């Protein structure tokens, strides 16, 4: 191989140290070995690594593999996801929900700071599964969701709490299909993914938004829906991401859908979204108690904007 061709091939790849691979993890990018300037595929996307294979690579002298430069953002998300904490399954539901809440917040931070990859959506599905299983074991565990996060961390904690409240409401409504509950949980986790592209200064602005600023904020459902367009997700979480700001009256956004066109699952997440926003400290509002939030929803929103059955189910969850 001539020198210029070798340099050209090398310029398309970057080093990926084997010690960055984590036992029992799955890489969603191709990795190559370099044999005399020939880059040979070693592992394709979706490959699951074992401790034995990682040890074998080291013993064979392969301390580094190679990754296409175009996939570097995937490697960064892989490492961020792989370093997230695990949730101990021997904890009680009330303890486990707090651990899942912290895990969900850390995951959302990864989601907002990196590329949305296959590893990212796979992790969201696993968190949704853990959350659903925890709430099915004891629905009242949602009473232990924390209120410690101030507005600086609101965005990260908000999504996992919305997910938890949504599943609890769905269970209270009598929904028992575990896969459906996990889809609702997943939609809750991802519902605000479009806010990745909204300036933090707007999200945390203490004063009223100008019309152009409000237009940017209101764009996040469509942006989020576009962000997950290439992800392997079912219809329900996609609908939740796109339509969680719709209202039964038809006065919501982005499409002005009314109760005749909105999935029940979407309406559940809409209520959970509003409830958590009301009970959280924001830069522009003081946090309400749960009772104050329920009272506000009952007298200001229930008539036209909120699903009555979902509201009664939420009250049941919080007074169990």
Model-identified regions with their sequence ranges:
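Non-catalytic interface/linker regions that flank or bridge core catalytic/transmembrane domains
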Residues: 1-149, 153-154
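Acidic/His-rich, divalent-metal-binding segments that scaffold phosphate/diphosphate chemistry
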Residues: 83-218, 225-236
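Alpha-helical scaffolding flanking metal-ion-dependent phosphate/phosphodiester catalytic sites
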Residues: 162, 183-198, 209-311, 320
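Short, charged helix-to-loop "capping" segments that act as catalytic/coupling loops
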Residues: 63, 170-181, 299-308
């Amino acid at each position: 191989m001539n020198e210029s061709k070798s340099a050209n091939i090398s310029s398309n790849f970057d080093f990926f140290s084997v010690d960055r691979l984590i036992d029992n993890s799955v890489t969603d990018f191709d990795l190559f070995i370099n044999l005399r300037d020939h880059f040979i595929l070693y592992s394709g996307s979706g490959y699951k690594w074992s401790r034995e294979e990682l040890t074998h690579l080291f013993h064979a002298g392969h301390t580094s593999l190679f990754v296409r430069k175009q996939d570097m953002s995937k490697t960064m998300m892989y490492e961020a996801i792989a370093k997230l904490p695990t949730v101990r399954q021997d904890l009680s539901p009330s303890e486990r929900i707090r651990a899942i809440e912290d895990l969900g917040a850390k995951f959302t931070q990864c989601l907002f700071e990196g590329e949305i990859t296959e590893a990212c959506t796979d992790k969201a599905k696993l968190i949704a599964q853990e959350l659903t299983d925890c709430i099915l074991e004891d629905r009242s565990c949602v009473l232990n969701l924390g209120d410690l996060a101030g507005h600086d961390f609101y965005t990260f904690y908000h999504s996992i709490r919305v997910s938890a409240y949504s599943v609890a409401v769905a269970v209270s409504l009598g929904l028992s299909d575990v896969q459906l509950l996990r889809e609702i949980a997943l939609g809750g986790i991802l519902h605000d993914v479009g806010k990745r592209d909204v300036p933090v200064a707007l999200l945390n602005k203490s004063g009223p938004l100008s019309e152009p600023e409000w237009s940017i904020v209101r764009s996040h459902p469509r942006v989020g829906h576009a962000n997950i367009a290439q992800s392997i997700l079912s219809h329900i979480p996609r609908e939740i991401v796109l339509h969680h700001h719709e209202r039964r009256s038809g006065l919501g956004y982005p499409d002005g859908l009314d109760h005749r066109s909105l999935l029940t699952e979407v309406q559940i997440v809409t209520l959970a979204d509003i409830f958590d926003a009301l009970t959280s400290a924001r830069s522009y509002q003081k946090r309400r108690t749960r009772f104050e939030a329920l009272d506000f929803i009952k007298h200001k929103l229930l008539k036209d904007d909120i699903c009555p059955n979902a509201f009664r189910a939420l009250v049941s969850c919080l007074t169990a």
